[in-house]
Amino acid sequence: MSNGQSVKAVAKYVRISPHKVRQVLDQIRGRSYQEALMILEFLPYDAGSPIWQVVHSVAANAKNNYNLDKKKLVISEIFADEGPKLKRIRPRAQGRAYKILKPTCHITVVVKSIS
């Protein structure tokens, strides 16, 4: 893998708020692959599970597609973008309806190999 090349994985339409996901992402940004997995495994947040899956997936992409060693991977970029909102309604008194917005997000992880 040359200096400019990186390996990427994306989880789309994850049914959790991007704000909640970003709180967890900030804790693993810039860390090694193994360190990030360890942190994610023991965090008390629900956002840890989908992030763990994406980090695991990007490492598998690096190993299978580029023959990189998982022990040398470092998370160079990790971010959560806002996805579409699921629109639902809550019935209220006198025939009214309140809108419920259920947010989704897209989680992107980019890793680079250190030599």
Swiss-Prot record:
Keyword Chloroplast on entry: yes
InterPro entries the record matches: Ribosomal_uL22, Ribosomal_uL22_bac/chlpt-type, Ribosomal_uL22_bac/org-type, Ribosomal_uL22_CS, Ribosomal_uL22_sf
Sorted UniProt keywords: Chloroplast, Plastid, Ribonucleoprotein, Ribosomal protein, RNA-binding, rRNA-binding
Gene Ontology molecular function: rRNA binding; structural constituent of ribosome
Gene Ontology CC annotation, any one: large ribosomal subunit
Function: This protein binds specifically to 23S rRNA.
Protein name as it appears in the record: Large ribosomal subunit protein uL22c
